[in-house]
A protein has these predicted regions:
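ATP-dependent carboxylate activation and anion-phosphoryl transfer catalytic cores
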Residues: 196, 210-211, 230-305
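Anionic group-transfer/hydrolysis microenvironments
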Residues: 59, 137, 178-179, 191, ...
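Conserved N-proximal alpha/beta basic substrate-recognition cap immediately N-terminal to
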Residues: 5, 12-117
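Extracellular structured ligand-interaction cores
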Residues: 131, 187, 258-260
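Phosphate-binding site of ATP-dependent enzymes
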Residues: 152-245, 264, 272
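Short catalytic/ligand-binding loop motif for oxyanion handling, primarily in non-cytosolic enzymes
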Residues: 16-18, 62-64, 141-144, 183-184, ...
C-alpha cells in the first residue's frame, strides 16, 4: 500500500474539467489520501509511467481514432477499467454478443463495410414502419446518431445518406427501431461502482425526430435517486451476466471500477438494454447527493490497495 497513491483522471482536450458534476472529484480524492491529477489521454508530453492508477473518464474523442486510443491503453501499468475491457466495450458489437447470451437488447440490423451493400440492399434493411435509429458501432455519446421515420421520403433519403456515408468511411452501422417508451417513460441509467449500485438516473432522450444528434446536446436528467426495486433487479441481473461473460472472455475474474447500464421499458413490464458503458460513461455524479463521494470511495479503495 502507498501512503498517497497517485491517481490520474483521464479526459480529452475539449473537456479539461471532466464531465459536468465531476469538478469536485480531485478534492474528494485528495481528502481520501490520494494524489490526484487530470491529464489528456493523447497529450504527448505526459509521462504515463508516472501516472499511478489511471482512471478513464471523459475521453469522448476516442472514437475518432480508436486504434490510437487502444494502443495508448496498452502502455499503462494500471488502468481502470482495464485495457481488455476498454477494447471490448469501445465497439458496440458487444451488444450482439450479449444478445446471444439472452440479454434483452434492442433488435439490431448490423451493416458492415465489407458487405459492399448496394443502395437497394441497404434500403431493404430499413424497417417497414415506425421510427428508427442509425448509429455507428464505434461512437461516443450521441455522436453521429440519427433518428428517422419510415413514412417520410426525405427522412428515408437522409437515413440512406447517413448509412452510406458511415459505410464509406469503413464504419460498421447499427440500425434499430426507435423505442417509443423512451418518449413516454424516458431512459434509466443504473450506475455501479466496484460492482455495487450507487444511484439511478431517469433521462429524456437527446435524439429528436428527423435529426442527427448534436454532440453538444445531452440527455436531460429528470430524476436521480436510488433505483426502484424493479429497475434494480434488472440492473443486477445484467451486471451479473456481464461480469460472468467478461470473466469467461478474458479468462480471469474482473470487477469493473465503474459501469453504467442504460435501460428502457419495453412496454411489457420488462426492460431492454440500450447500452453498457465501461469507457467514457457520464456517471451523473452531480445529479444526486452522495454520488461523487461514492465514486471517490471506489477509486480510493483501489488506489490504496
Amino acid at each position: 500500500m502507498t501512503a498517497h497513491p497517485k491517481v490520474t483522471l483521464v479526459t480529452c482536450k475539449s473537456m479539461p474539467n471532466l464531465f459536468k458534476g465531476e469538478e469536485g472529484l480531485l478534492d474528494e480524492l485528495a481528502a481520501r489520501g490520494c494524489d490526484p491529477q487530470i491529464k489528456v489521454w493523447n497529450d504527448p508530453d505526459v509521462d504515463w509511467s508516472e501516472a499511478g492508477m489511471v482512471v478513464v473518464r471523459s475521453v469522448s474523442d476516442y472514437a475518432s481514432d480508436r486504434p490510437a486510443f487502444l494502443e495508448w491503453t496498452k502502455q499503462l501499468r494500471r488502468v481502470q477499467n482495464s485495457a481488455d475491457v476498454l477494447n471490448w466495450n469501445t465497439d458496440k458489437h458487444y451488444l450482439k454478443e450479449l444478445a446471444a447470451l439472452g440479454m434483452p437488447t434492442i433488435p439490431t440490423n448490423w451493416l458492415e463495410p465489407e458487405q459492399n451493400l448496394s443502395k437497394h440492399q441497404i434500403h431493404t434493411r430499413f424497417p417497414a414502419f415506425g421510427e428508427f435509429v442509425v448509429k455507428p458501432a464505434v461512437s461516443s455519446g450521441v455522436r453521429d446518431i440519427g433518428r428517422y421515420t419510415t413514412v417520410d421520403t426525405r427522412q428515408r433519403q437522409a437515413a440512406m445518406r447517413q448509412v452510406q456515408g458511415l459505410l464509406g468511411e469503413g464504419r460498421s452501422v447499427m440500425m434499430q427501431r426507435y423505442v417509443e417508451e423512451i418518449d413516454l417513460h424516458g431512459e434509466i441509467s443504473l450506475v455501479f461502482f466496484n460492482g455495487l449500485v450507487s444511484h439511478a438516473v431517469e433521462k429524456r432522450s437527446a435524439l429528436h425526430p428527423a435529426s442527427v444528434s448534436d454532440p453538444a446536446v445531452h440527455e436531460a436528467v429528470v430524476t436521480a435517486e436510488a433505483a426502484d426495486s424493479v429497475a434494480w433487479k434488472w440492473g443486477e441481473e445484467i451486471r451479473r451476466v456481464l461480469h460472468g461473460y467478461v470473466r469467461s472472455r478474458l479468462g480471469h475474474d474482473e470487477q469493473f471500477l465503474f459501469n453504467r447500464v442504460d435501460l428502457v421499458p419495453d412496454g411489457k413490464g420488462s426492460f431492454l438494454v440500450m447500452e453498457v458503458s465501461l469507457v467514457d460513461a457520464d456517471l451523473y455524479l452531480g445529479a444526486t447527493p452522495g454520488a461523487l463521494g461514492n465514486f471517490a470511495d471506489a477509486i480510493s479503495a483501489r488506489a490504496h490497495w
